[in-house]
Amino acid sequence: MEIYIFIGVFLLLITCIAPRDKTVFYFFCILFAMIGLFRSHNVGTDCIAYSSAFRKITLNPNTWNLILPFEPGFNVLCALFKQYISSSPMLLWGIMSAFYTFNMGRFFRKYTSNINIALLLFYLLGTYMFSFNIIRQSFAFALLLVSFSAMNIEELRIRDFFKCMLVIVVCAILFHSVMYALLVVPFVALYMKKWNISKRFLFFMLAMSFLAFYFNVAVNYVMGFVDQTGLEGKLINYAIRNAQIGEDSGYSILKVTFVSVWAAFLIKMCPVKTDLFLTLYIIGVVILNSFGNLVVEFARVYEIFNVFGIIYMARIWSMKRIGLQLYLYRIGVIIYSVVLFVNLLIKNYGEIVPYEFRF
């Protein structure tokens, strides 16, 4: 845990002094890549199971999916790596983690000038550890970031719209089906190129999803009580199963509430014309609130959309505002990210603590 805290404090102090310094940015990108590259198999949820599956995979399709079901592209990648580069699964997972980090950095450079603020949030909000815990999904998302960085999704042309759709579908088919959720990105980007989505509408979506979340929580407790009285039935059992808080996702009732309140604050901070990245982030929070307690994959979808929120939060770090309002926002960002970071370490979501080197 100490290494995570030391890096977080060090990055926080430097970032507040130099939010746009490229030397600092490249240094931490390389550091993060090295940490991901040289971690042991005990760091991250997927590593042990994925490594067992990797050892079975060859270029013969009959050896695929014997332990875990992988998409065909991921099976081929593992087989080719094992055949021609190395039989070490941790080397492949480490390279994927570094690939994820570098493409995230490229994405930040494309869409915000406050690159170190984005990198700080990337680390403190746990998005960096995403590549430790959800290997296929983070790699698929990194491939999409290559496309998002190559084009300007804020000024999406019709031709780029179809390219973006194609890349998302291909990544979803070959590497991880959760990427289908990102099909909303080109549609929202194309819509917002001509029309604005009002802050009031974003508030409405957020509020409705928040109410839906607490309705599910209430159903969970009520049905649990009814179940204890012996009044069981198919409908009751169905309601209980579908109202559980997704413990695997690491999102408790308090944490979802915290995220939702922060999302409302970000909408309030937005100028008259809403930002594409804010809109995408709010969509992610709505997905978390509405469906994250039903299926853990929806909580993972939120983690992807959280990257768009990082861009927005980094952008308004230096927005021209009345002095006090801007400083309150900066303090709020630091408190929000530090609270989630501490929660991440204490609860050890994804088995990232303690950090161990592979050698």
Each predicted region: which residue ranges?
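Transmembrane-helix signature of polytopic, membrane-embedded enzymes
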Residues: 23-26, 108-125
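Extracytoplasmic catalytic/substrate-binding loops of multi-pass membrane glycan-assembly enzymes
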Residues: 42-50, 65-76
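Alpha-helical transmembrane segments and terminal signal-anchor/GPI-anchor hydrophobic tails
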Residues: 48-52, 57-60, 75, 185-301, ...
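Loop-to-helix entry region of an early transmembrane alpha helix in multi-pass inner-membrane enzymes
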Residues: 72, 84-99
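Transmembrane-helix motifs of polytopic, lipid-linked glycan transferases
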Residues: 95-111
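Membrane-water interface signatures at transmembrane helix termini and the short loops
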Residues: 130-144, 148, 175, 266-318
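Membrane-interface transmembrane helices that cradle and orient dolichyl/undecaprenyl
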Residues: 144-162
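Membrane-interface alpha helices of multi-pass inner-membrane proteins
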Residues: 163-176, 182-188, 285-289
